Structures are given as C-alpha cells and as structure tokens.
C-alpha cells in the first residue's frame, strides 16, 4: 500500500487525493518548448471557434468599443454561419449601424436571440418590423453586468477585438495602430465568459502591460488584419457638434449646472453621449476657470473635451469605461490620472460599489421626454428602434442632479410629448429638462427650480413646453403597432420597465 492509499484508509475525507505522477502531468505544455509559450495561439478564427467549443444554442458575446468602426462582430458571425451553427444568442454590449449584415444571419436562424444595449440602422428597422421570433432584450450598461452576475445571461464564448496582445493574452486598447482606448465593456466579458477568444491586430512581446484583459482570463488568441477603425468611434451618438441650436442648448445646460447648487469645488460630472450633451463640456470650462472651481472626477464615456479640462487641471481624474474619440484614447495611454474602469465598476447596481453613485451632475440626451419626465432613448417618432439604453438609467438613478438636453422639435416632430413611446428612464430620476425653448424642472426638485429662477434662467413648466411643441407641429398621428412584442426594455435592476411592439406595416 503506497502513501496515498494509506491516507485514504486512515483519513477517509482525503480519499480524493491522487499520488504524484510527473512534474508536468497537469501542465503537459511545459514539457513542449513550443507549446509552453504559444499554446493559446490559433492560425485562424475558425480554429479558435473549434478549440473554444462553440455549439448550437450557445451564447456568444462582443464589445462595441470601436462603435461604428467595429469589424469583429460581422466577421465572426459570418464565419459561424459558414460553419453551420444555429440558434445562437448574440450578447453584444451594443449594436450599431455597421452591424446591418447580421440581418441575413437572423433570417437563416444562426442568431435567434439578442441581448444588447441598443441598435440602429437597417438591423433595428428590420427587428422593429418583426424580423425575430424572440424579442430583443434591451439592457443598460450597468444592467448588463447584473444580468451576468445574476445568471440570466451566461456567455459561453466571448470574441473580443483588441489592438494588441501578447501570446498569453495580456491586451489593452491604448497601444497598437488601431487604438480604441478603454476596454471597459470587454473587461466584463473576459471576467464572466466560460471561454475568451481574443482577436488582435498585433502580437507584441510578453508582458504587454498595462493589461486591460489579463492572461488568466484568455483562452485563445488569433491575429487578424483588422479589428476596427478607430476613426469611426466618434460618429453617430458620439459625434462632435457645430450645430448652433445644439450649442445653445449645451450652453443653457452649463448655466443650469453653474446655478444648481452642485457646482462647487470637488464636484463630479458625466456628460453622456449625444451632441448637445458632449458639447456642454466646453462651456463648463469657461465657468470653471472664471470661478476657480475644479472637479474631483469625470465619469463614463470620455471625450477629448474632458481630456482638455483634465490636462488644464480643471478635472482631477477621469474614470473611463469607453473612449468617445481618439484624443481620449491617447490620453488614457499617457495620463496616469486618466483611469480605465469596467462597466461593473462604472454602473452595476448589483456591485458592492458603483462609481456612478458618487456623481453630482450628469448630462443626458433624449429622443422623447414626456410631461412626467419619463425619457425614451430607444424608439424614434415612427416607433422604430434607433438608439441605445447605454448608461442612461444607471447614472440618472445615481446622480444628485440629472439634466436631460434636447431640442423642443426635431424635423417638426415634438421631443416633449404627452407620453413617451418607450419608457427607459423613469421620470423620478430626471431633475431638469433643458431645451431651446426653456428649462423645465421636475416638481420633485423645488429647491433646484428656486435656485435657477434666482439666477435669471428661463424656467417654464414642462406642460407649457408640450403645448408649445404641439402648437408648432400639431398633435402627431399615433403610431400603429401590432400586438407582437419585438423588444423588452430592462431597467438596470433587471425588471421590465416597458416593451416595444412591432411597427404595423403601412397598407
């Protein structure tokens, strides 16, 4: 009887212990000089798919740090289609106009379920008109992490595009020819996925530091020609505006912040996406310089405008879950107080602490806002999905002051409505609406209204804004829907706050 067998006899609770075999019995790759370092490398995406064990019915995930420049999602799904896979759940952190190619793979049954923060373009139009049998699950950035945490969403294989990686899988978005900046979305997928496949443009020597995605999270690595075009990050919702009306609204929003009571040394802010929201930053600069007020941190999607304020000493730290332009990506690489954070750290309501809980002020956009301050950023005036939840309801719930910026009308279509088509963020989370026709304050915040009126700002009742909009456009014709549900709007805690129904075809 050997030593291990004696242990089994004398200590029954140790019966699972095994006798020593060889130094490399559990790590055979260490006995192979080539496999020791290159065992994760795959010659093609197809090889990585096979090694990762993708099967019909599984869930695959992607990140959208490259936004409209992404080349990974379409490439991988097209390959999976050619390989014959069916009934897959697509769990991308978001989908863009560039993902219209997915339509054919939904029609053919390759993709049968989708979890995403949002969608745009022909893909969104097709789904809004009933393309899928299963409704799309629309979640917030923080809410996505909670779905993963709670086990409703389980990623089998994550395909994550990165500019550079070493042969063990240490990767970041701040080096290489196609820098996208923060990999805050991908960090979550790398943590939760059963298998992680990196698609990288460049293989660099070990160790590739700093690493956003680390070697103990990564299973396989494929070098590809391109994962994305960083020049297309700052288009669409992340574009920079020169529109006079949007700039005027941005200036009004900066005035609201200045006189809100929260504009004081050490305040914190997030400026969100949307042209007027991001433009607000440039107007905050002059107010901060004039008053000597410096911010403790800015959070969320980071823009070049926020980087300018940081480098001028007006914002102490930048907490970055997504870079909205090349200037922000470059800053993340060189500025030690420009810090990358995951969407879990950013806004997960189920985490032990979400950074958004520390926010004083947030500026957000809206497709519609109703007289009860409920906000829609998902569906357009035609009922078609054309936006994203993003971090909207996350930061609106957490910030001390939530400001929505929007024009009163868009192409003669009212933004202020009686009731939003789709409710994403509840009115109880919205404090102020800033439009080109005046500023409305939620009645639940009388102290804010009083401060703004004392400052001489144009304060109006939100019902008056609605009446003004209707007087200019008339009452819009109601959108006709069928009974089929094509989208489920999940609040950040996972609950259902609304649904999207199929748009009825015109006869």
PLM regions and their residue ranges:
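Conserved alpha/beta enzyme-core scaffold
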Residues: 1-507
């Amino acid at each position: 009887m050997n030593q291990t067998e004696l242990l089994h006899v004398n200590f029954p609770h140790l019966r699972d212990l095994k006798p020593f075999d060889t130094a490399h019995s559990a790590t055979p790759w260490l006995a192979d000089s080539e496999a020791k370092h290159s065992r994760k490398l795959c010659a093609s995406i197809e090889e990585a798919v096979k090694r990762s064990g993708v099967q019909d019915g599984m869930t695959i995930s992607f990140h959208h740090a490259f936004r409209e420049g992404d080349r990974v999602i379409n490439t991988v799904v097209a390959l999976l289609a050619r390989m014959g896979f069916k009934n897959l759940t697509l769990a991308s952190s978001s989908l863009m106009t560039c993902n219209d190619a997915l339509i054919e793979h939904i029609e053919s049954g390759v993709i049968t379920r989708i979890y995403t923060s949002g969608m745009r373009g022909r893909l969104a139009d097709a789904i809004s008109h009933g393309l899928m049998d299963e409704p799309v699950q629309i979640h917030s950035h923080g809410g996505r992490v909670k779905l993963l945490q709670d086990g409703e969403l389980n990623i089998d294989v994550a395909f994550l595009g990165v500019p550079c990686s070493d042969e063990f899988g240490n990767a970041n978005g701040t080096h290489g020819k196609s820098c996208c900046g923060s990999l805050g979305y991908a960090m979550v997928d790398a943590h939760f996925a059963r298998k992680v496949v990196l698609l990288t443009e460049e293989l660099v020597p070990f160790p590739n530091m700093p690493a956003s995605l680390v070697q103990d999270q990564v299973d396989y690595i494929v070098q590809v020609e391109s994962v994305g075009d960083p020049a297309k990050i700052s288009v669409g919702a992340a574009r920079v505006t020169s529109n006079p009306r949007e700039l005027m609204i941005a200036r009004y929003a900066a005035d609201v912040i200045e006189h809100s009571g929260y504009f004081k040394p050490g305040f914190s802010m997030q400026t969100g996406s949307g042209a007027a929201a991001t433009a607000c930053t440039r107007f905050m600069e002059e107010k901060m310089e004039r008053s000597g007020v410096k911010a403790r941190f800015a959070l969320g999607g980071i823009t070049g405008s926020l980087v300018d304020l940081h480098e001028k000493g007006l914002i102490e730290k930048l907490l970055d879950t997504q870079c909205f332009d090349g200037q922000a990506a470059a800053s993340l690489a060189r500025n030690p107080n420009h810090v990358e954070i995951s969407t879990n750290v950013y806004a997960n309501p189920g985490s032990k602490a979400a950074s958004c809980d520390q926010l004083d002020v947030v500026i957000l956009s809206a497709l519609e806002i109703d007289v009860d301050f409920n906000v829609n950023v998902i569906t357009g005036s035609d009922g078609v999905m054309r936006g994203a939840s993003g971090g909207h309801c996350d930061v609106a719930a957490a910030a001390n002051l939530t400001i929505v910026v929007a024009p009163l009308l868009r192409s003669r279509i009212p933004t202020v409505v009686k009731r939003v088509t789709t409710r994403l963020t509840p009115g109880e989370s919205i404090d102020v609406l800033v439009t080109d026709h005046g500023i409305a304050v939620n009645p639940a915040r009388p102290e804010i209204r009083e401060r703004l009126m004392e400052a001489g700002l144009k304060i109006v009742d939100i019902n008056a804004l609605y009446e003004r909009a209707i007087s200019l456009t008339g009452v819009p014709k109601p959108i006709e829907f069928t009974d089929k549900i094509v989208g489920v709007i999940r609040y950040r805690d996972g609950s259902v706050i609304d649904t999207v129904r199929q748009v009825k075809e015109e006869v």
